[in-house]
Amino acid sequence: MKEYIAFIKDSKFWIPVLILVGLEIGMQFGCYRPFLKKNSYAANVSRITNHVLEKQKEFDPDILVVGTSVAYQGLSIPILNQELSTLGKKVQSIAIPGTELIVQDLAVLKTLPHFKNVKTVIHVFEVTTPWVGQKILNLPTLAMISEFNRLEVYSRIYDFDYQVNVNDLIYITLKSIAYRRDIQDLILSPSKRIKDIGKRFKIENLNPWDYENSYLERISMYPIQDISNCIEKTDPANGQPIPEGSDRFHKKAIFDTCIIANHIVTHAKEDEVTKQYFDRLKILHDEIRRIGKENGQNIQIIGVVAPYSQLIQKWRLTERNEVWKRELKRIHPSNPVPLLDYQGMLDGSDNGDYYYDLIHLNSIGMKN
């Protein structure tokens, strides 16, 4: 026992402990946030939600866009605002890449109470998501939800019926755990991170919206006929030359989405996974309407099914659309969310010119 007490009193023990506690406290107050890796999950969710709130006084929207990377890349907020300016309407977006419904819900909880004028929410859906739901909290989702109000996150992970374990709770609670991979990357590659941070401070985003898609790369740069052909021609390890105008990042993005397209289920069967998705969607939509009422608005939610490359026609099942409509009516019997289906709106001989990869539009597709 004496040896144990002596060890506790030894400066070799408590000085490192105090340093670790001090670092954790600093991270809890957001001191590390400016140093997060560019476009990481945690950096994206913080940057997007904080930016729209910072610009709220000069740009207070009437319409709010909610969704994932499909909406983030596929909708031009400047063009939408230009088109709606004659009606006196303003559009803002809190679409965040890689988000499950729980992250979209937390983004709504953080931002919508400040947007008192929002009367319409456009929720951009991906047609396949009800069939690929998650019961556990994966690392990207943990990284994003840990950036929100902790008290809201703790209750939300149970409301959304995740299978929560102790490690999940530790990850959400301790920033030193949540940021450990990011810190490791910073230590291994400090020069690149410093350059990114310098650019961020030097080039300030003065626009009210966080992002505008500027990608000019397109699928049609690669002679792709079908999914198996796509995997073969865009495999980063195939050694084939990269077409002019493309780069290794674009090639890999196409490859990754071809792998996804090759593995995602192509049926429209309803099971526990699909039911859970729509139960979670109900929580999100109920929250939007509740906050709207608190803001003095009767918010109308409009569902939009995003377009995909026509190379993945097998995702477009009439039966899936019927499941969507049926489930949207089940979760809101008195006021079901209308569903606008734009899956095939860019089909045609030049379809490949509009897509960066199989799922995301490029700048040309966004403008169309």
Regions found by a protein language model. Name each.
Residues 140-293:
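Secreted/periplasmic serine-hydrolase-like ester/acetyl group-modifying domain
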Residues 124-128, 304-308, 342-345:
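Short loop/turn segments at strand-loop or loop-helix junctions that form parts
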